């Protein structure tokens, strides 16, 4: 699957805090496996999505494919996604890597308006 080169693990994948993005984390960035999602909304619909993860190919697969499906959806529709949906969206992962489905689901569950520091 071809994905924009800028998607992969670059700092620009995180929007500025001033963008009014929603942010959710599955796992703790810098402390092992994690997936972080930032959504920018326009009229209740996802206009832009940025993701970061720990860099494992399985984490990249899940975040890339989730990003493709989340863009253009409402927050209500996104919050209805369950683990089975994410597994279907992301495709099969190698043995022992299924926890990335759960990390993505947790990041979605934890989506909150990002606070300015």
Predicted features, each with a name:
Residues 1-117:
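Domain-level signature for proteins that mediate thiol-based redox and metal-cofactor handling
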């Amino acid at each position: 699957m071809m994905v924009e080169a800028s998607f992969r693990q670059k700092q620009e994948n995180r929007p500025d805090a001033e963008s009014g993005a929603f942010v959710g984390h599955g796992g703790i960035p810098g402390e092992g496996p994690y997936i972080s999602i930032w959504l920018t909304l326009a009229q209740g619909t996802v206009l832009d999505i940025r993701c970061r993860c720990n860099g494992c190919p399985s984490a990249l697969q899940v975040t890339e494919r989730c990003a493709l499906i989340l863009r253009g959806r409402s927050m209500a529709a996104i919050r209805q996604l369950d683990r089975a949906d994410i597994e279907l969206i992301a495709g099969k992962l190698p043995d022992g890597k299924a926890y990335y489905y759960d990390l993505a689901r947790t990041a979605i569950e934890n989506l909150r308006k990002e606070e300015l520091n």
